[in-house]
Every structure is written in C-alpha cells, then in structure tokens.
Amino acid sequence: MLADAAPLDSIRHLIGKMPPASERAAAAARARQAELTKPQGSLGRLEEIAAFLASWQGKPSPTLDRPLVAVFAANHGVVAKGVSAYPPSVTRAMMQNFSAGGAAINQICGAFGVGLKVFELALDIPTKDITEEPAMEAAETAATFAFGMEAIDGGVDLLCVGEMGIGNTTVAAAIFYALYGGSAADWVGRGAGVEGEALARKMAAVETAVALHRPFLSDPLEVMRRLGGREIAAMAGAIVAARMQNIPVVLDGYVVCAAAAILHAVDKSALDHCLAGHLSAEGAHGEVLRRLGKIPLLDLGMRLGEGSGAALAVGLIKAAVACHTGMATFAEAQVAGKVGG
C-alpha cells in the first residue's frame, strides 16, 4: 500500500483519504437521547460519547463488544545520552511482564473486558540517536506506519492506543517542540522519573535534536521520521487504519499524543474519530490536548503509559453505550415527558 510512491508522500496520501463521520447516524442518536427517560442533557458527556460512537460506527445505536488496547513498544538511540531513569532493557522486560499478565494494563483490561495486544518493534535495534542523525530512514518510517495499520484486525469496535519504550517521552517532547515551538522546557517532563542532572540532559537532548533537524521540520512527517520512533510511526498508522475502518479511537497519554499530533499537523480533521482517554500528569499533556482540541474523559494523575488511561476510559464509554441502548424512552416506560417551559 505504501510502496508505490515516495514513502512519506504515500503516508500523506492516505491521511488525505480518511472518511468522515456519519452525521445521519449522529443525528439519529441525538434524537433517541431526546426521548430517553431523563431530562435532556442530564447525562452530560455520556450523551456526547454515545452520539460520537454512533457517528463513527454509522448506526444510531452504537455497540461496544470488542474493545482493544494495542500497545506498541520500541527502543530509542537517544537513551545513550542519559535521558532516562531506566536502561533500554526494561522495555523487553516489560514485554515479558505483559505476556505474563503482571502489568497494570493487564489488570485494567481484565477489569473492563478489554482485549490486549502488544507489538514489539525491533527492540534490539534502537532507532538512531536523534541528537546526531534522523531516527529513521523514510522507507523504515513508512514500513513501520504500515505495520501499525495492519495490526488492527477487523471486528474491533473501539481501539485504545498505548505504548511502551524507554526514552520515548524524550522523543515525544522533541516532536511537540518541533510542531508547536516555545522552548524545550515547555515540553520536557520527568517521564519515568528523571530528575537533577538526568533531567538537564533530557532537556539538552531535545534542544540539540530540534536544532539539528530544524531545516526539515516544516513537514510533520519529517518530524516523525527525524525525531520520533518506531512506536510513534506504528501508532500513527494504527490511528489511520482505525479511521479507514470506521473504528473510534481512544488516545492514551503524552507519548500517544505525539503520534496523534503528527497526524493532526498534516490534516486538522485527522483526529476527528479520536477521544482523549485521560489527562496525563506529564506536565505538557494538557497543552497538547488543548492544541489537538480534545477534552480528556478522566483526570486521575496518571503517567504510566501502556494504554492504561485509555483502557480505564473504556468503562466510562461502556456506561455511555449502556445508557444509550438500554434506557427506555418516555413512550416505552409510559412516563410523561417535559411539559410547558
């Protein structure tokens, strides 16, 4: 799919072909909401969520039978600059923990009946150090984007996007700095717990990387290639694949939103099918969501990653669907509707 044209241009072409929502289905969902046994608007954002799902699933009564968390894992060459509190080996160790069912995301998915798939992206071959050269070649970027697209099986009715990768808050900060400007300090946070000299090294790495690649950063896809990582490209591909299949998406936190921000910078409508699952405690995430035009569903002070915040939001989304499809209308319940003013 991505091999016929110049690699990055083929990604751009796909983004430009993404289908719109069904306004007819959304209108029908809102009409049903108006007839349910409650004051109009009294369920707040639950009503908005139900109409949102209806618009992307293309039916007045949305379903939520096969939600999936897809976690993409990768390692980053910039870790060699001492930007993380943990070594790259932790990424593989966490893959084993996911497989054994011992991670937080396993428990959250189990609690809410959400499927979980974890995808390793060449963990033993980190991307290049972004302070010295581009993270990936264009062909590698496109191939990884395509892998992310193919990772989304048919039958999924809600996709939660997550990540795992030592050093990936550094590349996410570099992406936001490149896209939105300001200073590195505006976007760099503590990630998995860096402080002191390590935090200063992280800040310096982001400054150096963006300065090195600045002549090429007017193109968001070059931002992804030069400053990103394999999980960033794969998550971007998964988000686009979901759109092509009319699958609504729940974004997780800070790093996932770096992939989302790339798509949004290419096309402002690219994230119309996405909800923000939560507000991360990684400081700049709130500003990122503001720029993406997303209001988070949850704010629990989390900064774990793994798709954990998105998975937690599934419980809320399931409640929205249950109310929308299971509540009686005024006529069905033989309850009088609103009278007068």
From Swiss-Prot:
It comes from the Bacteria. GO terms for molecular function: nicotinate-nucleotide-dimethylbenzimidazole phosphoribosyltransferase activity. The active site is at residue 306. Its EC number is 2.4.2.21. It is an enzyme of class 2 (transferase). SUPFAM superfamilies: Nicotinate mononucleotide:5,6-dimethylbenzimidazole phosphoribosyltransferase (CobT) (SSF52733). GO terms for biological process: cobalamin biosynthetic process. The keyword Glycosyltransferase applies. Pathway: Nucleoside biosynthesis; alpha-ribazole biosynthesis; alpha-ribazole from 5,6-dimethylbenzimidazole: step 1/2. Keywords: Cobalamin biosynthesis, Glycosyltransferase, Transferase. InterPro entries: Nict_dMeBzImd_PRibTrfase, Nict_dMeBzImd_PRibTrfase_bact, Nict_dMeBzImd_PRibTrfase_N, Nict_dMeBzImd_PRibTrfase_sf. It catalyses: 5,6-dimethylbenzimidazole + nicotinate beta-D-ribonucleotide = alpha-ribazole 5'-phosphate + nicotinate + H(+). The keyword Transferase applies. Catalyzes the synthesis of alpha-ribazole-5'-phosphate from nicotinate mononucleotide (NAMN) and 5,6-dimethylbenzimidazole (DMB). Belongs to the CobT family. This is Nicotinate-nucleotide--dimethylbenzimidazole phosphoribosyltransferase.
